[in-house]
């Protein structure tokens, strides 16, 4: 049997933009993507600390070192620039594998979204 577990978590980053006219997704600095063991195109959940909204989208890469966290398409209506969000990726694992699994959880600087 498979269970869904947290695989990756970017804890408390500041939204740098919201682009309603973009096709969709969340644009992230590749440094954040790599540190959290996320993959381009991976489905993620985004939780907005400011308003309680939860949404699903997928990851695309922005400019390296930019600290970018931009919600695109319909998700742009759920955030405002400056909001604090958590980005979570999940994985399906066998129960025994899940018991031993350790997720990649990162805590970037909340003001700059840079890795600490």
Model-derived features with residue positions:
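Compact, glycine-rich, soluble single-domain proteins
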Residues: 3-5, 10, 14-99, 111-112
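Short, glycine/charged-enriched hinge/interface segments at domain edges or termini
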Residues: 102-105, 109-116
